Amino acid sequence: MLKFYKMGIKRLSGEMTMGEERMDLGIEFETTEEIPVPERLIDQVIGQDHAVEVIKTAAKQRRHVLLIGEPGTGKSMLGQAMAELLPTEDLEDILVFPNPEDENMPRIKTVPAGQGRRIVEEYKRKAKEQENIRFYLLFFVFFIVAMAVFMSRGDPNTLLLGVFVILIALMVTANMRFRTQAMVPKLLVDNSGRKRAPFVDATGAHAGALLGDVRHDPFQCFSGEETVVIRENGEVKVLRLKDFVEKALEKPSGEGLDGDVKVVYHDFRNENVEVLTKDGFTKLLYANKRIGKQKLRRVVNLEKDYWFALTPDHKVYTTDGLKEAGEITEKDELISVPITVFDCEDEDLKKIGLLPLTSDDERLRKIATLMGILFNGGSIDEGLGVLTLKSERSVIEKFVITLKELFGKFEYEIIKEENTILKTRDPRIIKFLVGLGAPIEGKDLKMPWWVKLKPSLFLAFLEGFRAHIVEQLVDDPNKNLPFFQELSWYLGLFGIKADIKVEEVGDKHKIIFDAGRLDVDKQFIETWEDVEVTYNLTTEKGNLLANGLFVKNSGGLGTPAHLRVEPGMIHRAHKGVLFIDEIATLSLKMQQSLLTAMQEKKFPITGQSELSSGAMVRTEPVPCDFILVAAGNLDTIEKMHPALRSRIRGYGYEVYMRTTMPDTVENRRKLVQFVAQEVKKDGRIPHFTRDAVEEIIREAQRRAGRKGHLTLRLRDLGGVVRAAGDIAVRKGKKYVTREDVLEALQMAKPLEKQLADWYIERKKEYQVIRTEGGEIGRVNGLAIIGEQSGIVLPIEAIVAPAASKEEGKIIVTGKLGEIAREAVLNVSAIIKRYKGEDISRYDIHVQFLQTYEGVEGDSASISVATAVISALEEIPVRQDVAMTGSLSVRGEVLPVGGVTPKIEAAIEAGIKKVIIPKANEKDVFLSPDKREKIEIIPVERIDEVLEVALVESEKKKELIKRIRETLPLGVSESAGSETLHEHGRDSGSALSVEESKA
């Protein structure tokens, strides 16, 4: 037996030694600079010869293709290569036109590539000509009216008639302008100047992006600080927009995406909620909150007395018609609608003309100044009986004078202490000021909503507040802090930055508000603000009043239907390639729609999401004659829509992507080309020397996991190329050398490899992995994490009297998968055969130590068998030996996958010997330094495993003799080798990591 081991090691070492000699790469070169890189992508595909031929045929015959295989094998590259092979002469532009007969069914027209732009430009030119005609017509009307007024010598009737004619002319020309703009078509798909057919990657696309969508009129949003008037179930409330929307979104109706911005909305269509607009209240449809990077244009026009903070595309009503907020200038006059600020049933206040008080009342500025004074030094008591103001004498006198102007004579008293104090108990004054939002003792400070209607009112409030530095000592800063934050935001509209600090003073808090200068020296102030959140409301009439300004909202749909149509990826891929990776992740509904598009070669565009304008807009069928290149893994086939797969299979090809290719000179030459391609594609790393390329090819041999093969998981291999290039750049080298590649292999370890190293280090530290001595029932198994990372997997077994008198059980713990559990049961057949006695008297417990994330596969079979036999026979197992291999019920050791990374894990754990299946002998690729650290023992039968693994003793010799006598051994060397999968892994031999959470 000892002689057999030595021969095996010699053969294995001899093969690896040959690998160290200068490798035949099929081409002579010093660096990859000398290697020509093909121009066409199809010629850059490495190792997938069958797939390449299929793609060439499919491109010529316009067939669909389904590519199935593991990640990183070139599926996307083949899709792009197909696009290069398609002719460009057949490319078309697609335009969408308005439909005069039905505006909700825009018309579709296709023209040869390049003509679409010319058609749109021609329509724009005609629209501009009509705009000039409009201007000349207006000029002519003004001239005629002016002449008529002049000839009539100022006759009032003529003047009135002239004004009427001018208004009619303005209305007619405005409508003409809208109609001419609405007639300009939209270019949906522009293929002008294309030198190759379209390639569209639709991986992970949502329904609107894949199939096309009819977008909402641009979401026109507010800052949220604006005031709106809401009527809910008959009760009228004045609320800050932000507060209203946030409360509604406590119960959201849904959410979606508008580009990179998340939209959350509440549906009010079935609720009795209305919003005030120019002509009274209108039904509220939706309240929306948009989360994401956005810009607000903030404008203050002191001359025209308005301000706003809106997204640039928000439409505002001006005296010249609708304008976007981004286009408003200082000359524009915005339409402001008077709002009732305060009204109640009080005869005394009505007698002196203070009720009803509207936003256009001239006295409101004086009242705002009173409020500012009161907010800085006064309040009304909780019982609403006394108004108290503590301030300077001059301020008190100004306050009293203004009150007398509004209310006439009233009773008050002034107390002179450290500060002058004014007190009044006049019920008219108190009721009036409370109704307008005056500060009340014990309640939170809130800026009066009507002060925010106009900049003139805010400045009047600020004049009364007057102090640019305020310090307040309070018990709870959260009560007054929002007031100062809101004040700071409105000061920001004027370009004034205010600082707010909260300091602890004993058991109280001091709020410090510092606004610096409060001077405003410009009449028109414009600022831009980057925000993360905006708000808007959608109403039935498409408009509302915000801070008294008449503005449009997102429900108006003022943009013509055809301009809101957005093409889907299926339309942009017309006459080209539509690539979808992981196609099974598409919903069945989307797969069904994709099937329809493939069959009909046309697909109408309609609303696909909550954020579209809905299904009322539906275009004529839009051409989408694409070639589908779908991709996925093996489980993709099960999850695909059966009809979609049938369509591809019936009208195209299904291709399985190879994961390895034979290790021939020709294929090595292809890998040399691959390295040169990766360097050229990256553009930031130097070329590789011949030695460096050899090391890359050795890594390809190792990663193949099969004797005489090279890996085709070239994305991962490309990662090694780039990592080595980065190292060479860091060192300032002209070329990448072998040392750089070796360093890259250490530095750019996969996550699984890093976890495996950490796992081994930790288990050794806590002595979970043992590498010395012998123990009964304990074996060091080997497993795989991910694709290429090995790990030592301790397995323990004990034998106990059966809990049931009827039968014994094999009890396995360690979160085993189905294949692993069945493999353990197979071990019992061998035990029963050699034991020669009824083992139903025993319960056999097998534990895979600390495998929290589970174990799958049958590569631990010989480890389990060894542990159980050791426990039954009470023979210790050597702890400096690790093993991997599948086991048949006849006692044959069958091949498994990943033997190289498993052996590397054993080396790192400090193990001296490793047992592997004989069939995997030539699958081992180790560097010379690693090979010196371990003895590799290939075996074919379970008795050979026990010969190596068990500690020498008389019981061991008797056991092995019994096994050889009872088991049907003596199989050929190649037995079972066909069970090794092409991708180098046993049937599920994998460990999805343990301890990642520990």
Swiss-Prot record:
Subcellular locations according to the entry: Cell membrane
Residues annotated as catalytic: 859, 902
Post-translational modification note: This protein undergoes a protein self splicing that involves a post-translational excision of the intervening region (intein) followed by peptide ligation.
Keywords associated with the record: ATP-binding, Autocatalytic cleavage, Cell membrane, Endonuclease, Hydrolase, Intron homing, Membrane, Nuclease, Nucleotide-binding, Protease, Protein splicing, Serine protease, Transmembrane, Transmembrane helix
Domain DOD-type homing endonuclease: 370-496
Topological domain spans for side Cytoplasmic: 1-131, 177-998
Membrane topology term: Multi-pass membrane protein
Role played: ATP-dependent serine protease that mediates the selective degradation of mutant and abnormal proteins as well as certain short-lived regulatory proteins. Degrades polypeptides processively.
Subunit: Homohexamer. Organized in a ring with a central cavity.
Name of the protein described by the UniProt record: Archaeal Lon protease
Organism: Pyrococcus abyssi (strain GE5 / Orsay)
